[in-house]
Amino acid sequence: MKQKLNRTTFKTSREMDFFSQKELVTQTGHEIGEWPFVIVKELVDNATDACEEAGIPPVVTITADASSITIADNGPGLPESTLAAALDFTIRASSREGYVSPSRGAQGNALMTLFPMPRVVDPSTGRMIVEASGKRHVITVRADPISQRAVVHDDVAEIPKSKKSHLGVSKIKLALSSGTSIRMEWSAMAEEDGIIRWPFGGLAVHGKACAGSFVRRFRDLCMGFAMFNPHLTLHIDWFGKKQTFKATNPQWTKWLPSDPTSVHWYELQHLERLIAAYITHDRDTGQDRLVSDFLREFDGLSGSAKRNKVLTDAGMKRTKLSELVVVGHLDSGRIAVLLDAMKRHTRPVASRRLGVIGEDHLRKFFVDGLGCKLESFRYSRRTAEQKVKNLVSGDGDKACFIPWCMESAFGYLGGEDDGADDERRRIFTGANFSTSIKNPFRSFGGTGEGLEAALNKLYVGAEEPIVFGLHLAHPRVEYTDRGKSSIIVGG
């Protein structure tokens, strides 16, 4: 008799999506050699957001040495609940999920992708150290090869108030009882010739023969945060070489994640996604909110009079949000009526409310921070409300009014150092007040040409001693990939 195999159906935990180089490349959208940029970008974004939410002008320190990268801030301190959620790999917890807004991190699961990194790049000693709210967490995260589940070790100790930080984050005083310091740590790798390598694909980061392009990219990524955030004071400590960019306007403001979002930024599929997220949350917490309570979350609908008009037009007085689910599906027809009523009784948001970096700040940054010639500095700002047809709802006449603000700045370095690395073209790009790891402006409108091609046409090639900055504030920034390497810009 011919032998027959009765295959067993095996279940693999989705927790494994974070515990290998391949999976983390998928989650972050970046190869291992770019993970140091991912670490800095995500942690500085989180630090700046936390300070803004607390009404504190952010002060952020980025420290890099042979065995670690550390980000420290002066914010309110990472909540224990947020840390615990980031270490639960069975769920995805995010305060950004579902909302449409000009926030720095729309995915909101940055910490979850960062915690497994130390053991992926250094299986023996890699670890994460978090200091916040008077406690020091030494965290190691790995995967059990048999059960394929996450194994999390979090050793917690109180930080004596009289002692300095264990992280050695320069000599800048940081009140760790009210701030957060996160250090990704690995074993130092120094070669006989003095070259120091990081375990991210063997990157040479310090020494005579180190990869200058990497060091330059790392530095420019850090500096980009200061360029696009006038209220930020940024300290950079690269192997003991320190640089500080002071805030030019500590009271500068922008649209915050805690600000109510505008219904004019939503199309039907966006509102359905948000409603579904609220219903799921209410089921998990034993609630069943009214549509009226849901409306309070939106810009221009905090007053009862406006809400009553919306509810009357939509026929949803005393209607519960869960009633918008019929036989296991969202009632798109009723939600479309609700969306139309919400837009009819509110005003679109003016583009200036998103936040404007401003000419004064950029001039000071280009001249004092980067060394550009004052007389060469140029600045441009374009703002508008973009009319986007709502094709999903089937009614092309109805539209979303999406505000946007694009700012650009140019400066000439002078070329006095005869081809030095700092005297080549430097491009800084960002969206929603966060700097980009790669230039995301790959295609403008219908021409298909990107930023570099546009600069080349203006005789500003890669070898020219200039600095160019481009920033877009937009509540519905869309990227072509998870790594945010290409932004979609309509023309």
Task: Show the residue positions of the predicted features.
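Charged regulatory segments coupled to nucleotide-binding catalytic modules in large multidomain enzymes
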Residues: 1-6, 148, 152-155, 160-164, ...
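GHKL (Bergerat-fold) ATPase N-terminal catalytic module, capturing the glycine-rich phosphate-binding loop
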Residues: 1-177, 181-182, 294, 298-303
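Structured core elements
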Residues: 61, 70, 77, 112-113, ...
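Short coil/turn segments at secondary-structure boundaries
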Residues: 99-102, 234-239, 292-296, 308-310, ...
